[in-house]
Amino acid sequence: MSSRRFLVCFYTSNINMATKLFERLSNDYLKLLDDKEDFNVIISTGESSKIFQVHSNVLRYRSLYFHNELAKASKDENNHKKINLNHISTQQFEIIIKYIYGGVILIEDQDASFIFELMLVACEFLLEELVKYLETQLIETNSSWLRLRFSHIYKTSFQNNQLQDLQKWCNDIVAKYPDKLFESEDFISFPENALISLIKRDDLQMEEKKIWDYVIKWGIAQNPGLSSDPTSWTNENFLALKATLKTVCLLFAFFK
């Protein structure tokens, strides 16, 4: 996988022509990242708490996450704001911070597992462009890896609404091979939005009665107090299941 850099880009308007020289700009900002003279933010990452000395203006305008964190971060005796990211590996953050400063993505030597975890970190930092890029890399060049871990990938993608492309990729597969999802051990732990996204599709290759059986199974699992035998249920038990499946039931009525 080759690294990505923003190169020279041209556009023409009705009035004039402008030339955008991004590569030099990118290189200059990467030099700024290495410049330790004017930093005003200290970020610690990884188990070893490696320190990154960075600049608040760059972080604030490149990432909504850092914009919010900087607003509440306290200053030390040297007037530096401190942010603790010890749950993020140093290797991951080195890639993230180079993207934030220079718009470069250096992942050519990384495997699919690392790229997937990096994508989740990019989601945390609300870096939409980077998330989209990493999604594309996984789907286009690591689809076999995704398929081998399909249940985990599916569940994770629907736990984060930023992963729209990955959600669609997963649902396209489930529409053709529904047992891949419905027969998985993790099915009952899937989020409601995943179930809803499938019911909304008109190309799901499964009979409605069978889909409904799985929906009931999922609904029961969301209520730990419910027995798997409906004949033993009280009126309160039925009401609890009805409340759990309220949104899903409305979709069945609408798409029927």
Identify the meaning behind each predicted range.
Residues K36, D76-N78, L241-L245:
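A generic structural signal for short, non-catalytic loop/turn and secondary-structure boundary residues
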Residues A73-N86, M119:
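Short, conserved non-catalytic motifs in the polymerase core
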Residues N27-K31, N68-A73, N160, E185:
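Intrinsically disordered, low-complexity boundary segments flanking structured domains
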Residues N57-A71:
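Short active-site loop/helix that positions an aromatic residue
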Residues N27, Y65, N78-H80:
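Residue-level signal for pocket-adjacent positions within structured domains
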Residues S2-R60, H87-S113, I196-S197, R201, ...:
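N-terminal BTB/POZ boundary and linker segment
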Residues I95, Y101-Y214, W218-F255:
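Post-BTB helical module
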Residues F52, S63, P224-G225:
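Intrinsically disordered, low-complexity acidic/polar segments
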